UniProtKB/Swiss-Prot annotation:
Name of the gene encoding the protein in the UniProt record: aroE
The keyword Amino-acid biosynthesis is annotated on this UniProt entry: yes
GO CC annotation, single: cytosol
InterPro entries: Aminoacid_DH-like_N_sf, NAD(P)-bd_dom_sf, SDH_C, Shikimate_DH, Shikimate_DH-bd_N, Shikimate_DH_fam, Shikm_DH/Glu-tRNA_Rdtase
Annotated shikimate binding sites: 19-21, 66, 91, 107, 224
Highest taxon in the source lineage: Bacteria
Residues the record lists as binding NADP(+): 82, 133-137, 157-162, 222, 245
Family: Belongs to the shikimate dehydrogenase family.
Key words, A-Z: Amino-acid biosynthesis, Aromatic amino acid biosynthesis, NADP, Oxidoreductase
Protein known as: Shikimate dehydrogenase (NADP(+))
Length: 276
């Protein structure tokens, strides 16, 4: 890319109309007076490789990747970071000047940064964490919790085989628990995390007994529509510290924006308002 070319970035998905990323990145571009563009791109799975290969030649410096391309993009990239390999998905692309494509994953960074911001008194080493769900988001959460020093993680999923598979990936600190037992691994947890879509507007409810919630537990939900899910409402009523999922979306975008546009953006109330 020549020095006088305006840097381009965007988000690739199918569909893409739901993505909040354009609103957020355009807010930051305007806030910091950065000369750059960020655009949503609807890309069908069969066109993914040809589009991504063409992007560096068109002046793109990188892109975010969302459903359904977060796994398949790893097969296309020239290099995949270790954390993206561990999480089994990539959400951020960096295009080098020679055209090389690097796939990374910033979801774990976004999760743990949001958690520390929303629950500054939470101590990773204070006790076990209970995690609902065994999809890509779950892997990012687990990786970041292990790195933070959480001693034990109880992973529960509606399909037990998926929970066992993820647990085996991460080793002895992660134990798979039957979904019907989910309510029994809450009371002595220091942290409870929902990584499923259950509780999201238009999705089924998270039907897990929550009577084990009490003050001293931090509860966070990756769902941010609605912003206060039934899980967070119940946790708040039980005296827990609650952290909504919007901050993860904001924080995971920071590393990519900084890399592409040379400005580290701040996650603040204005950024939250930009995507609500």
């Amino acid at each position: 890319m020549t020095e006088n070319r305006i840097p381009l970035a965007g988000v690739i998905g199918c569909p893409i109309a739901h993505s909040k990323s354009p609103q957020l990145h355009r807010h930051w571009l305007k806030t910091y007076g950065v000369d750059g563009h960020y655009m949503p791109m609807h890309v069908e799975p069969e066109d993914l490789e040809s589009v991504v290969r063409m992007m560096p030649r068109m002046g793109f410096v990188g892109a975010n990747v969302t459903i359904p391309h977060k796994q398949s993009i790893m097969e296309i990239a020239d290099k995949v970071t270790d954390r993206a390999k561990l999480m089994g998905a990539a959400n951020t692309l960096i295009f080098h000047e020679d055209g090389a494509i690097v796939a990374d994953n910033t979801d774990g960074y976004g999760f743990i940064t949001n958690l520390h911001e929303g629950a500054p008194d939470w101590d990773a080493k204070s006790g076990p964490a209970t995690v609902f769900g065994a999809g890509g988001a779950s892997r990012a959460v687990i990786a970041s919790l292990i790195e933070a020093g959480v001693p034990e993680i109880r992973l529960t999923n509606r399909t037990r085989s998926r929970a066992k598979e993820v647990a085996q990936t991460f080793g002895s600190k992660v134990t798979a628990v039957d979904w019907v037992e989910a309510g029994n691994v809450i009371e002595d947890a220091s942290l409870v995390v929902n990584t499923t879509s259950l509780g999201m507007t238009g999705q089924r409810r998270l039907r897990v007994p929550l009577d084990g919630l009490h003050s001293g537990i931090v509860v966070t939900d990756l769902v941010y529509n609605p912003l206060k899910t039934e899980l967070l409402q119940a946790a708040e009523e039980a005296g827990c510290t609650v952290v909504d999922g919007l901050g993860m979306l904001l924080h995971q975008a920071v590393p990519g924006f900084e890399r592409w546009f040379g400005q580290r953006p701040e996650v603040n109330s204005a950024a939250r308002d930009a995507i609500l």
